[in-house]
């Protein structure tokens, strides 16, 4: 746990916001088991905070990246497309795609990304839109992850968004955010970033999340949640030179 200083709001550009965050990382494991462990931990954290009505929305950036690669879109156009899809700006996406000389079949799939969110049915729909192997592999991983979450009874907390992207270009696989009512921003964000550590040395498969404690507490307050705290225990007070006896 620690304080972070970052500007994540489009309404306060140029101003840093201090917030308290807590999170976890799993490094050195690129398996779907690691994805499951981190997503389950996110759900456990939200449940332990007393939240009952919340959703963890999961996407996979490899679906989008597969389409970009096939269409040959990169540079400024790719960055603009990320922003527009992330904002669910359907008409902005349409205008940009119309200005590019790309295969209409790929363009049609990209145009649907702002609307490809919801239940597990979204994944089945997306799988029928393309034959791109990278895209289908991304869908397959999400389907398998959902099957595992269903086994442990956590599927009721899960929804999907294939338009879930990030201006942080380091995400390499699944990406997720946790939402609950009472606050207008995610309580938790995270995803897989297998190439990030490599910028500081050697590549290590990594997945993790960060939970905004301030946003979580605001949600708990507005939902009038009162989480019992165990205050039982013994307070041991001792002088500096009496540590051995205190132990």
Predicted regions and their residues:
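Hydrophobic mid-domain F-helix/FG-region of cytochrome P450s
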Residues: 41-47, 63-70
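Short, conserved phosphate-binding/catalytic loop or strand-edge motifs used
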Residues: 17-22, 58-66
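Acidic, His- and aromatic-enriched active-site or binding-groove loops in soluble protein domains
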Residues: 73-95, 102, 154, 180
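Positively charged, Gly/Ser-enriched RNA/tRNA-binding surfaces
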Residues: 1-51, 97-247
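Short low-complexity, flexible loop/linker segments enriched in glycine and/or proline
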Residues: 70-72, 174
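Short, solvent-exposed helix-helix connector turns and helix-capping sites enriched
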Residues: 60, 88-89, 119
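Short, surface-exposed recognition loops or helix-turn segments adjacent to catalytic cores
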Residues: 53-63, 81, 159-163
């Amino acid at each position: 746990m620690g304080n972070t200083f970052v500007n994540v709001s489009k309404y306060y550009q140029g101003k840093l916001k201090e917030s308290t965050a807590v999170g976890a990382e799993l490094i050195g494991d690129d398996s779907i088991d690691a994805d499951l462990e981190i997503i389950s931990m996110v759900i456990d954290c939200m449940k332990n905070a007393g939240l009952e009505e919340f959703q963890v929305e999961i996407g996979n950036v490899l679906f989008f990246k597969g389409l970009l690669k096939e269409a040959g879109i990169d540079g400024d156009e790719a960055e603009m497309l990320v922003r527009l899809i992330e904002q669910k700006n359907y008409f902005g996406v349409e205008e940009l795609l119309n200005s590019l000389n790309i295969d209409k079949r790929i363009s049609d799939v990209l145009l649907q990304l702002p609307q490809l969110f919801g239940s597990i049915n979204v994944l089945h729909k997306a799988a029928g839109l393309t034959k791109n192997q990278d895209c289908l592999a991304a869908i397959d991983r999400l389907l398998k992850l959902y099957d595992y979450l269903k086994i442990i009874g956590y599927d009721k907390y899960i929804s999907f968004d294939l338009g879930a992207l990030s201006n942080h270009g380091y995400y390499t696989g699944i990406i997720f955010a946790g939402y609950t009512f009472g606050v207008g921003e995610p309580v938790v964000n995270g995803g897989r970033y297998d190439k990030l550590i490599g910028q500081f040395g050697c590549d290590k498969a990594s997945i993790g999340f960060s939970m905004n404690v301030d946003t979580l507490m605001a949600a708990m307050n507005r939902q009038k949640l009162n989480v019992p705290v165990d205050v039982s225990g013994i307070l041991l007070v001792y002088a500096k030179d009496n540590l051995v006896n205190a132990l």
